[in-house]
């Protein structure tokens, strides 16, 4: 009897862990993505100017996932899993993403058979002009071209 209880308990714990992991990834996937409006934005511990600053972002157009809202505040998560609260006046609808693949190539057209025009390192911020099923047309620095959509964090789905 004790062995059956242990097996049942183990099975229940395993089930809830799997469901919890799956639902967290789905929640992020279906959330709205915005970007930072200014070169310097404060991430706060809670939804008010009374809460302490947790982190200072210093990158305009950094994409963030909106997790929750409270009045004029949005709870966000960035590509490094930092989370906290930002006032809505500091958020923009400008579409941007972060390159998550080492030495990604930007192509002149939306095919790997077109001319490569630049190579991106991990963590590079790109502005999204438009996306197709597998590709996004992006701008970064002096380069405009196409990159594989699955290399980007913060892309339009």
Predicted feature residues:
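SH3-family beta-barrel domains
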Residues: 23-45, 55-60, 67-109, 115-133, ...
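N-terminal signal peptide c-region/cleavage motif recognized by signal peptidases
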Residues: 18-22
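Second-shell loop/turn segments in exported
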Residues: 47-51
